[in-house]
Amino acid sequence: MHEAWLPREHPLHRPRHGAKQYVALVCAFLFFAAPVLAWTLGARAKPLENRPLASFPSVTEGWGFFTGLNDWASDRLAFRPQAVHAVEGISEGVFGEPAPHGSEPGGTPVGGGGGGEQPPSTPDPALFPDVIRGEDGWLFLGHDVSYKCLPDMELDRIITGLRRWRSVVEASGREFRLVIAPDKSTVYSEHMPDEYVGRDCMRRLRSEFWRRVPEATGAIDMRPTLRELDRRRDDPVFTKIDTHWRHAGGLAMVRRLAESLDPGVTTTWKVEPGRTYQHRADIPALVGKDREWTVRSYSLAPDGGADNTRFLGSDFQEPLRLESRARPGMIDEPTRMIADSFTQFASPYLAASFSDITIAHPDNVLSDPEGVGRMLAEGEVVTFEFSERFLAGGRYAMLAPDMAERVGEILKRNPV
């Protein structure tokens, strides 16, 4: 018998819903109903972080349906950017310091050293800030740290997944290339603060990641190229306020990729300064600020003649197809690429130097493995570009063994 059905004078009687319970139920209803009501009134939420909005959880996920509702509702609050901006303004205006945004004041930072009690083996995700403020105005994405301290996959499993993808691609007669775009906090670690949440656990995994993954998977390690490029430039390859490399980094990646496929092919390239335009920085948006940085692009003539770049904005959620007439200095084998946002700053130069290339987002492999398999089967070269934080953190679901197997079956039926 439920306690609420007992007589009120019974010592075990408990009302089904007390006053506090009703308040909690009303608050929960308002929280989850607010996105629906805002959508009905015409308000639309926009991505605040460097990722798509969380999708509505499926009822087939069991308890995952209920745990996923929080992310869905939070992401779809149309006034979320204004709320973040208000919190930041109050914190700086009243208290004279930035809002913590997930960090917890006081105590020893998780993974931050400093002696005392040992940190828990599994740090609380709420301790990690969205943004890490470095010296001289440098801002770093908090996921550079949190994903390494709270990885979804062990490094051995990540390496196994990458090797399996290489195996299924090469077994079909195709060439395979993997490029790793390093985190800004890796390339410019000297601008990180001395103390921050997760410092030690991030450094440990980062060191092991770069020591093992390129050698074990045959990946193209962009770190030496970017450091040499930075040494020869007046401006850093990354801006202080965005988590992505500039076009100079994207162009350097394309050059490394082309040379790996056809050594010497870039000797005829003519690269000159191109147009400039303003681009919204992604990191300040996480603390409610709207800042822009000046993008300096390039022209690229693969044969030393006319510029062949094309600027087509895309997040690759819808595959981007780029074709042009083959010229000297170009890779003319059909190439199919899985890439994330770092390649957005490289796509003009891929268009200039690859006569037939299609780029799709890693999320597409999970949502439509058959469609991605058919796309990859159109190419003779398959290339992956993965960012360090997502790869080291095991955040690419396509690294699961069944994903490579499903796509590999399609490639096997369509050999080169």
PLM segments and residue spans:
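Extracellular glycan-modifying ectodomains
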Residues: M1-V416
